[in-house]
Amino acid sequence: MNESESELQARLLAKALPFMQRYENKTIVVKYGGHAMGNPELGKAFASDIALLKQSGVNPIVVHGGGPQIGAMLNKMGIESKFEGGLRVTDQKTVEIVEMVLAGSINKEIVALINQTGEWAIGLCGKDGNMVFAEKARKTVKDPDSNIERVLDLGFVGEVVEVDRTLLDLLARSEMIPVIAPVAPGRDGATYNINADTFAGAIAGALNATRLLFLTDVAGVLDKNGQLIKELSVAEAHALIADGTISGGMIPKVETCIDAIKAGVQGVVILNGKTAHSVLLEIFTEHGIGTLIVP
């Protein structure tokens, strides 16, 4: 006899119940980015996942990026992107567009998607409620010929120096789901564009989040045979960076995970945001679908 759809849903919910109980009243920060942001169907699936987390008693917080959309808007407005050491230089005109795209357009699109599920999302950035303060990022690059380090001036690219959790604690006690753009003020009065991964890590650390999820375009951390590594300690992650197993763009991602754990996050997961309902599959199944990094 074939299992009906309702019977299948009931069986899946029964399996998920222990995990729902485990995460009840816990904070889960989700960094939303990558391919999933540009796919309408994946966007709807993501919004429904966040809504179900809230309905299950979890306190979800969304932090989002938007690099491709920023680049597209700069091109549309005829502003040429400048790069130093492979990093985008953000001048005054550029940071104004960054804030417009991140805190305006993208943020409100995500808020609208979640609101369409029947839940209440609220769009924020680091400026709201003095939630986050930043300072000018200090980046260096080493000259391959002379081996001398050179300081890069990236303009209004910032690093988080302070997180005030007051507003987020208030929202956690409400029915609201915060959706946060990685833009923050400095004590100098300037506006700074902040890497969304490090911004999410700082938020999660300040809240001592149970989980921080990074939605990416890859399955997670892979071993030398290309197989997914399900769990890593911080020490094991350092060792895999040292021996070259973790390489390229995955290195800064894993280093951000490690920083978040040092800041107080209980566990950080790198997972594939291109998988529909990836958030639920990670949180409400026994083994998850990504790589969990723990202390």
From Swiss-Prot:
TM ranges: none
InterPro entries hit by this protein: AceGlu_kinase-like_sf, AcgluKinase_fam, ArgB, Asp/Glu/Uridylate_kinase, Glu/AcGlu_kinase, NAGK-C
GO BP terms, alphabetized: arginine biosynthetic process via ornithine; L-arginine biosynthetic process
A GO term, aspect molecular function: ATP binding
Domain of life per record: Bacteria
One Pfam family here: AA_kinase
Keywords: Amino-acid biosynthesis, Arginine biosynthesis, ATP-binding, Cytoplasm, Kinase, Nucleotide-binding, Transferase
Chain sites annotated for binding substrate: 66-67, 88, 193
Function: Catalyzes the ATP-dependent phosphorylation of N-acetyl-L-glutamate.
Family: Belongs to the acetylglutamate kinase family. ArgB subfamily.
Designated name of the protein: Acetylglutamate kinase
Organism encoding this protein: Rhizobium leguminosarum bv. trifolii (strain WSM2304)
